[in-house]
Amino acid sequence: MKYDLIIIGSGSVGAAAGYYATRAGLKVLMTDAHMPPHQQGSHHGDTRLIRHAYGEGEKYVPLVLRAQTLWEELSTHNEDPIFVRSGVINLGPADSPFLANVAHSAQQWQLNVEQLDAAAIMARWPEIRVPDNYIGLFEMDSGFLRSELAIKTWVRLAEEAGCAQLFNCPVTALHHDNDGVTVETADGEYRAKKVLISAGTWVQALVPELPIQPVRKVFAWYQADGRYSMKNNFPAFTGELPNGDQYYGFPAENDALKIGKHNGGQLIHSPEERKPFAAVASDGSEAFPFLRTILPGIGCCLNGAACTYDNSPDEDFIIDTLPGHDNTLIVTGLSGHGFKFASVLGEIAADFAQGKSPAFDLTPFKLNRFTQ
């Protein structure tokens, strides 16, 4: 049997692609080295932010707005919502380039964003403390996603639609010829007209020339009472300290507030190097500078987890065909800010498999930007 599309890596983007391509009527095989959702990539830990006024650059805004529509559609397939509209407050110095990008994106795309000075931030959310020179940009239509529930839902819907699934089975090699692609796995060989490589952190095992640097990251839950919950209108947040360090976090659930540091981490070169939470001495205290400054009422660290970023050199996505092989799409380099886009990236991959032109300008995400 020859598939229309074989997906290598069925985490966030791959799971979405499997569903959307199967729904479009294609013969699809989803593969993964583990059983998605799993703990080996970047999608675990229950929740991920979704921001619309994008501080990483306005080139992402059309993608995230389409992603939002798809997330809301996906939520209709569950009793529990996948998207939670908590609002997101972006905090930082008034001269922060990140916040300038947020404001610019909001203006360009007429997004619902409110700017607050330091006094207004602390009046609305007394739990938050900020220096006098800080501002907040509040995205009231943004919030967070239940990441593992999303992947479970896509995998289930794809299977129900007739998608073949081969999990706990690593892909070991790809071979291109004039008639398509042969995908070698521990279970045997499979043939496809087109392939999506969405293998996350360890994509270089299949495509060694990709400029991807795996980074070990951690996030943790800290003791927090009901003041920090959505019942008290406490939002999700991003925060930049005066030294430039960037943090993100979520409203407390079950008396625990999740927070992580976006920058930093440990460079790694194999899965074995991604040690569990607390294996690095700084893991449990990484968020302390932010908590002491911005959220002084938060309590002790309860538990945490490690994940992996697949960083590109400029921390922008890579969405491109494999050089010399127009039948193989690569989605990688999501650099720790990709989950919110998983729905639209999966749709882009499904369009690719159908021979459709992308609905977005993907030029900023091409591989050739690293050689120009």
Curated annotation (Swiss-Prot):
Pfam families (UniProt xref): DAO (PF01266)
Cofactor(s) needed for function: FAD
Residues involved in FAD binding: 4-34
Assigned keywords, A-Z: FAD, Flavoprotein, Oxidoreductase
Known EC number: 1.5.3.-
GO CC, any one term: cytosol
UniProt cross-references to InterPro entries, sorted A to Z: FAD-dep_OxRdtase, FAD/NAD-bd_sf, Me_Trp_Oxase_MTOX, MTOX
Cofactor binding mode and count: Binds 1 FAD per subunit.
Keyword flag Oxidoreductase: yes
SUPFAM superfamilies named among the record's database cross-references: FAD-linked reductases, C-terminal domain, FAD/NAD(P)-binding domain
Catalytic activity: N(alpha)-methyl-L-tryptophan + O2 + H2O = L-tryptophan + formaldehyde + H2O2
Top EC category: oxidoreductase
Taxonomic superkingdom: Bacteria
GO MF annotation terms: flavin adenine dinucleotide binding; N-methyl-L-amino-acid oxidase activity; sarcosine oxidase activity
Modified residues (S-8alpha-FAD cysteine): 307
Role: Catalyzes the oxidative demethylation of N-methyl-L-tryptophan.
Family classification: Belongs to the MSOX/MTOX family. MTOX subfamily.
Family annotation (NCBIfam families): PRK11259.1 (NF008425)
Subunit structure: Monomer.
The protein's name: N-methyl-L-tryptophan oxidase
Organism, scientific name: Citrobacter koseri (strain ATCC BAA-895 / CDC 4225-83 / SGSC4696)
Organism lineage: Bacteria, Pseudomonadati, Pseudomonadota, Gammaproteobacteria, Enterobacterales
Gene: solA
